[in-house]
Amino acid sequence: MKKIILVGRPNVGKSSLFNRLAKQRIAITSDVSGTTRDTNKAEIFIDDKNCILIDSGGLDDSNELFKNVKINTLNEAKNADIIVFMVDGKNFPDEIDKRFFYELSNLNKPIALVVNKVDSKKDEERSWEFNEFGAKYIFNLSVSHNLGTDELRDWIYKLIPKSKIKADTSDDFDEFLDCVNEHGEMGLPSVDYETKNIKIGIIGRVNVGKSSLLNALVKEDRSVVSKIAGTTIDPVNESYVYEDRVFEFVDTAGIRKRGKIEGIERLALHRTEKILEEADIALLVLDASEPLTELDERIAGLGAKFELGLIIVLNKWDKDHGEFDKVVYELRDKFKFLAYAPIISVSALGGKRVHKLYPLILEVYKNYTQKMKTSRLNEVLEEAIRTHPIPRDHGKIVKIYYGVQFGFAPPKIALIMNKPRSLHFSYKRYLLNKLRENYELSGTPVILIPKNRSQKESTENEN
C-alpha cells in the first residue's frame, strides 16, 4: 500500500489537510506551532484507491525537541512513496523552506509543493513567488475553506494503484438512491420544512455586535451588551415570530484568536460548533468599522463547514452606498467560498435596516430547503452539457446519465455517471453556476456528488 507523507514547518496546515483528506478529525489542529510532534497515520481511500496517509511533525531547527522531530520526519519521508511538502501562503518563500524542499526532492520520490492559506487574490499573487522552488507540481490550497484540495487529490489518485479492497461507498446512500430512482420524488424524506422552526445561529468574532443584533431582532434586551469583548459566553436563545414562522435565534459566544482562548471560552467555542450542527442558517456578523481579519475568514469557514444557509451582516454601518459597493467587492474577494451568501448592512444598536433581515432569512431558508423536480433538474443539466460538453478523460468519453436530488437543507444532488473520477472540479463548478442561474439558490450551498451507476452492480456481481 502506498504511503503519502505530509511534510512542512510547524503551523502550515498539515494536520488540517490530514483531517480533510482522511475526512475525519484525527489530528489536533491549532494555531500553536508544533501541535503535532509525533506522526499520525491513517488508512484512507482516495475514491476507489486506498493508501496510508502520514501527518508528520513540523520541520524546525529552533530547539533540541524539534530537531529530534525533524530527524523522525525525514526518516518517515525516506520510507514514504509520495511526499506533499506544505508552505504557508501568507508568507513569502524563505531559504529554510527551500532547503527542506530540496533535501526532500533529493530522495527522488514524487513530490508536490502545496501552498496553503491562499484565501484571496492577494494571496494568489504572492503564491507565484513559490515558483522559484522549481517544483514540477505546485498546488494552491485553502484547506480551512476546502479550496483546491480536489486538484491535489487528483494528483495523488494518479500515483497510487487500484485497491483490491472496496471503499465504503455508503450503503445507506445507495439504498436511498435506489429508493429515489424507484419512487421518484416520493422516495425523498418527508420533513415539513414549511412549518418547522427555523434555527439561526449568530456568529462572529468578539465585540462585532452579535448581542446587539439579537436584541434588535427580538426587540428586547435579552443578551447583555457591553464594550468588553466576550461578554456572551453561554449561548443565548430567543424566539421571534414573523409571518407565522418561528425564528429560533442563538447568539453564540464571540470567537477569539486560538492563542487567546482560555478554558471557559474553549468550552464556549465547542458549544458554538454544537449549535451550528443543529442550525439551518448562520448570520455571519462582521464589524464594518474595522478591516476584515483572518479570524473573520476562519469564522466564515464554520458556515461552510456545517453546510448552512448563510447571510453576511455588516454591522456598525454608517457609510454611504458607494462605500458599500467597495466593501462588498473586498468581501467577495476574501470570501470566495461564500460567493452564494447575500450581504446586508445594518446598525444593530440604532436598529437601522435590521427589519430587512426577516424576509431575507425566509428567502434563504426557502432556497436552502427547496425540492428540485428530477425532470426539471435534468433539463438544466442537459442544456449545460450541450452548451459546454464534458471534457474527455485521456480520449475517453465522460457521461452524466442523469442527476437526482437526494437531500435537502442544503440541496444535495447525485450525478450518476460512467466515470465520476473524471469530472474535473472546474466542470463541477460550471454545473453549480448553471444550477444557480436556473434556480433560486441565494444564501445556500449546493452539494454535487458524482456517483458511478455501475458501482453497486459491480459490487453485487463480485459477491
UniProtKB/Swiss-Prot annotation:
Q: Which GO terms describe its molecular function?
A: GTP binding; ribosome binding
Nucleotide-binding in keyword set: yes
Biological process terms from the Gene Ontology for this record are:
ribosome biogenesis
What is the superkingdom listed in this entry's lineage? Bacteria
- Among the Pfam families in the record, one is KH_dom-like
Question: Can you tell me which residues bind GTP 2?
Answer: 204-211, 251-255, 315-318
Q: Say if the entry is tagged with keyword GTP-binding.
A: yes
Binding residues for GTP 1: 8-15, 55-59, 116-119
The segment(s) forming the KH-like domain are: 370-454
Alphabetized InterPro entries for the sequence:
G_ENGA, GTP-bd, GTPase_Der, KH_dom-like, KH_dom-like_a/b, P-loop_NTPase, Small_GTP-bd
Domain EngA-type G residues, every copy = 2-164, 198-369
Going by the UniProt record, its keywords in alphabetical order are:
GTP-binding, Nucleotide-binding, Repeat, Ribosome biogenesis
- Quaternary structure annotation from Swiss-Prot or TrEMBL: Associates with the 50S ribosomal subunit.
Could you tell me what this protein does? Answer: GTPase that plays an essential role in the late steps of ribosome biogenesis.
Entries under NCBIfam families matching the protein: GTPase_EngA, small_GTP
Return the similarity comment: Belongs to the TRAFAC class TrmE-Era-EngA-EngB-Septin-like GTPase superfamily. EngA (Der) GTPase family.
| Protein known as | GTPase Der
Q: What organism does the record attribute this protein to?
A: Campylobacter fetus subsp. fetus (strain 82-40)
